[in-house]
Curated annotation (Swiss-Prot):
Keywords: Glycosyltransferase, Transferase. It is an enzyme of class 2 (transferase). CDD domains: GT1_Gtf-like (cd03784). Pfam families: UDPGT. GO terms for molecular function: glucuronosyltransferase activity; UDP-glucosyltransferase activity. UDP-alpha-D-glucose binds at residues 303, 360-362, 377-385, 399-402. Gene3D superfamilies: Glycogen Phosphorylase B (3.40.50.2000). Belongs to the UDP-glycosyltransferase family. It comes from the Eukaryota. This is UDP-glycosyltransferase 85A2. Its EC number is 2.4.1.-. Expressed in roots, shoots, leaves and flowers.
C-alpha cells in the first residue's frame, strides 16, 4: 500500500435514500473532503441509477479521493423516477442493508489504492451502520438531518407510548380537541401540543412501521460516537442543551450549505459534484432576475409530500387570487396516484405572472432578492434555507417533524404563518396576502433577516459556533486527537 494512500483518513458516508437526506449528507462529505479526508459516498443502487439519469453518465465518477459506491435497498428493482414509499423503505433498509454494507466495507479495506476505513458518518435513520462500525472498531457519527427540536421530540417518542398518548385508540382522536392536548414534559420545548409532535405518533396501529422505526433509531443514537445536526446554536440553543444529557456529544454544524460554501466553494471541482435526483431547471433563476425585490412567492412542497388533486387545485386558485407573481415547483409525482395537473383555466389566468418548474436549485432561489415569501411543507432543509435567505414562510406541514418545525417557525422564530391542513383557496389567498403585503409579513421578514445574519455569523466568522463545532468534530471524533 502506498504511503500517500495510507496517510489519509477514510470516511464512509451513508445517507438515508431520500432527496432531503442525500443533499445534506453530500455537504458533510464535501466539508470532510475539503479537510483532507478520503470519502466514499454510499447511495442505494436505485438512487445511484437515478443520479446517472438526472445528472448524466459522469455523475458518479467522483474524484481520486471522493468515490461513489452503492448497496441494494432490499426492494424490488425499478427504474421509475419516483420518491419511494417511506415506511416500506425504512423497513427494508433496517432489515436488508447491513449485510451488503459490511461486504462493501470488506471490499474497500481489501483494496490497496484507497486508505482503510477509519470512520463512518451515517444518517440517523440508517443506524444498521452502527453494527458494522462496532465490528470494525471505528468511530461512527450519526447525522440526524432533522431540526434539533424535531430530533428531541423523537428522543421522547417512547414516553408517548408510556403515557398512553400513542397509538391512539381510533381516528376519532384526531379531533382538534385531542390534538390540542398539552405536552409539558419535553425539556426546553415550551407551549407544545400533541399536534406539534412529529406526526408518526398519530397512528392507531401499535405495530405501525414508522412509530416503531423512529423509537428504535432514536434509542440506537445513544450508541454513536457523536451526533451531528444541521442547525446552529443561536437558533436552537436550549433544545440542543437538553438533548446533550440523553445522547453522545452533539455538534451543531449548520446551516451546512453556508458552511460548505465557505470551506469548499461551489465552483471548485468537488463543489460541482451534485446529488439531485431530479434534473434542476435553472431557467427559473433567469426568470427571477427580471422581477422586483420581494415580489415573488416561491411554492415548493419538497421531495416527499403528496397532495390530493383537490388540494393542488385549491392551492392553484388561491395563488391566482393573490394577484402576486409566483414560482411553483410541481414534481411529476406531487399528486398521489396521478399526474400532477393544474387546471388549464388557471394556466391561462396566471400566464403573465408565474413560472412552473418540476425541480429547481432551491438554495439559490431562496437567496434570490426577488423572493418575498415561501409557501412550504416545513421540511428542515427548506425551513433552514428560507431562514438563511431572510424569507418568511407560509407553513403547510405534511408529516414527520414538519409539524414541529412549523410550530417553532411560527412561535419561537417568528417567521411563519400556519395554514390549515384542509386547504381552502380563500385561506391560501388570505395568508399569502398577509405575508406579502401586511404588517405581520413585514415583521416576519425583519425577523427572518435577523436569523439570516446569525446563520452567516455561525458559519463565516472564525469564532462562529458552527465553524468551531465542525473543527471539534473533526479533531476530537474523526481524528481522535
Amino acid at each position: 500500500m502506498g504511503s500517500h494512500v495510507a496517510q489519509k483518513q477514510h470516511v464512509v458516508c451513508v445517507p438515508y435514500p431520500a432527496q432531503g437526506h442525500i443533499n445534506p449528507m453530500m455537504k458533510v462529505a464535501k466539508l470532510l473532503y475539503a479537510k483532507g479526508f478520503h470519502i466514499t459516498f454510499v447511495n442505494t443502487v436505485y438512487n445511484h441509477n437515478r443520479l446517472l439519469r438526472s445528472r448524466g453518465p459522469n455523475a458518479v465518477d467522483g474524484l481520486p479521493s471522493f468515490r461513489f459506491e452503492s448497496i441494494p435497498d432490499g426492494l424490488p428493482e425499478t427504474d421509475v423516477d419516483v420518491t419511494q414509499d417511506i415506511p416500506t423503505l425504512c423497513e427494508s433498509t433496517m432489515k436488508h442493508c447491513l449485510a451488503p454494507f459490511k461486504e462493501l466495507l470488506r471490499q474497500i479495506n481489501a483494496r490497496d489504492d484507497v486508505p482503510p476505513v477509519s470512520c463512518i458518518v451515517s444518517d440517523g435513520c440508517m443506524s444498521f451502520t452502527l453494527d458494522a462500525a462496532e465490528e470494525l472498531g471505528v468511530p461512527e457519527v450519526l447525522f440526524w438531518t432533522t431540526s434539533a427540536c424535531g430530533f428531541l421530540a423523537y428522543l421522547y417518542y417512547y414516553r408517548f407510548i408510556e403515557k398512553g398518548l400513542s397509538p391512539i385508540k381510533d381516528e376519532s382522536y384526531l379531533t382538534k380537541e385531542h390534538l390540542d392536548t398539552k405536552i409539558d414534559w419535553i425539556p426546553s420545548m415550551k407551549n407544545l401540543r400533541l399536534k406539534d409532535i412529529p406526526s408518526f405518533i398519530r397512528t392507531t396501529n401499535p405495530d405501525d412501521i414508522m412509530l416503531n422505526f423512529i423509537i428504535r433509531e432514536a434509542d440506537r443514537a445513544k450508541r454513536a460516537s457523536a451526533i451531528i445536526l444541521n442547525t446552529f446554536d443561536d437558533l436552537e440553543h436550549d433544545v440542543i442543551q437538553s438533548m446533550k444529557s440523553i445522547v453522545p456529544p452533539v455538534y451543531s454544524i449548520g446551516p451546512l450549505h453556508l458552511l460548505e460554501k465557505q470551506e469548499s466553494g461551489e465552483y471548485s471541482e468537488i463543489g460541482r459534484t451534485g446529488s439531485n435526483l431530479w434534473r434542476e431547471e435553472t431557467e427559473c433563476l433567469d426568470w427571477l432576475n427580471t422581477k422586483a425585490r420581494n415580489s415573488v412567492v416561491y411554492v415548493n412542497f419538497g421531495s416527499i409530500t403528496v397532495l390530493s388533486a383537490k388540494q393542488l387545485v385549491e392551492f392553484a386558485w388561491g395563488l391566482a387570487a393573490t394577484g402576486k407573481e409566483f414560482l411553483w415547483v410541481i414534481r411529476p409525482d406531487l399528486v398521489a396516484g396521478d399526474e400532477a395537473m393544474v387546471p388549464p383555466e388557471f394556466l391561462t389566468a396566471t400566464a403573465d405572472r408565474r413560472m412552473l418548474a418540476s425541480w429547481c436549485p432551491q438554495e439559490k432561489v431562496l437567496s434570490h432578492p426577488a423572493i418575498g415569501g415561501f409557501l412550504t411543507h416545513c421540511g428542515w432543509n427548506s425551513t433552514l434555507e428560507s431562514l438563511c435567505g431572510g424569507v418568511p414562510m407560509v407553513c403547510w406541514p405534511f408529516f414527520a417533524e414538519q409539524q414541529t418545525n412549523c410550530k417553532f417557525s411560527r412561535d419561537e422564530w417568528e417567521v411563519g404563518i400556519e395554514i390549515g391542513g384542509d386547504v381552502k383557496r380563500e385561506e391560501v389567498e388570505a395568508v399569502v396576502r398577509e405575508l406579502m403585503d401586511e404588517e405581520k409579513g413585514k415583521n416576519m421578514r425583519e425577523k427572518a433577516e435577523e436569523w439570516r445574519r446569525l446563520a452567516n455569523e455561525a458559519t463565516e466568522h472564525k469564532h462562529g459556533s458552527s465553524k468551531l463545532n465542525f473543527e471539534m468534530l473533526v479533531n476530537k471524533v474523526l481524528l481522535g486527537e
